Amino acid sequence: MDKKQYAIIEKYALPFVQTVFEKGQQEDVFEKLSQIKAVFAETGLADFLSHIGISDHEKEKSLRLFQNSGSQLLDNLIEIVILNHREDLFYEIVLESQHQLEKISNEFEVTLRSVQPLTASQKEKIRPIIEQKMGLKVRSLKEELDSSLIGGFVISANNKTIDASIKRQLQVIKEKLK
């Protein structure tokens, strides 16, 4: 994506996010954007909307399926995107809107990689530690299993990482022995 395209995406995303905050609908809109993002990931809809061989009418029909989402703000954004024939940028607008919502509210989805799944009590205990160490609020905790860590965990959010894995500790020891 070039600077011109990013500027266009911001032109849609930033006023949308500002309005979402003015109306106090951050949680609801973020959840709906997450659902849209999941649909795009599962179906490859972003490629469909950006394909030059697909008619504007077909692209419009596809985007209209997301209207009546229960969020008037999101429905209005979709309508504006359709009216301005920017369907090909809709997925990027969704991603940028989510990013801006996270950035402004300082609430992030935290990814926690570990060898074994954490119990509910472990998740409850680690949440305040993550918030304190990373200086953010945890919107949700996404767990990923990674047997290559050997033990421990790796926490990632907002371009920050805490690596408390045995794999990393072994790498540090290896570097010191060189």
From Swiss-Prot:
Membrane topology term: Peripheral membrane protein
GO cellular component term, pick one: proton-transporting ATP synthase complex
Gene3D superfamilies given in the database record: N-terminal domain of the delta subunit of the F1F0-ATP synthase
SUPFAM superfamilies: N-terminal domain of the delta subunit of the F1F0-ATP synthase (SSF47928)
Entry's Gene Ontology molecular function annotations: proton-transporting ATP synthase activity, rotational mechanism
UniProt KW keywords: ATP synthesis, Cell membrane, CF(1), Hydrogen ion transport, Ion transport, Membrane, Transport
Main location: membrane
Presence of keyword Plastid: no
Annotated transmembrane regions: none
UniProt subcellular location: Cell membrane
Source taxon at top rank: Bacteria
Alphabetized Pfam families for the sequence: OSCP
PANTHER family tied to this protein: ATP SYNTHASE DELTA CHAIN
Subunit structure: F-type ATPases have 2 components, F(1) - the catalytic core - and F(0) - the membrane proton channel. F(1) has five subunits: alpha(3), beta(3), gamma(1), delta(1), epsilon(1). F(0) has three main subunits: a(1), b(2) and c(10-14). The alpha and beta chains form an alternating ring which encloses part of the gamma chain. F(1) is attached to F(0) by a central stalk formed by the gamma and epsilon chains, while a peripheral stalk is formed by the delta and b chains.
Task of the protein: F(1)F(0) ATP synthase produces ATP from ADP in the presence of a proton or sodium gradient. F-type ATPases consist of two structural domains, F(1) containing the extramembraneous catalytic core and F(0) containing the membrane proton channel, linked together by a central stalk and a peripheral stalk. During catalysis, ATP synthesis in the catalytic domain of F(1) is coupled via a rotary mechanism of the central stalk subunits to proton translocation. This protein is part of the stalk that links CF(0) to CF(1). It either transmits conformational changes from CF(0) to CF(1) or is implicated in proton conduction.
Similarity comment: Belongs to the ATPase delta chain family.
Name of the protein: ATP synthase subunit delta
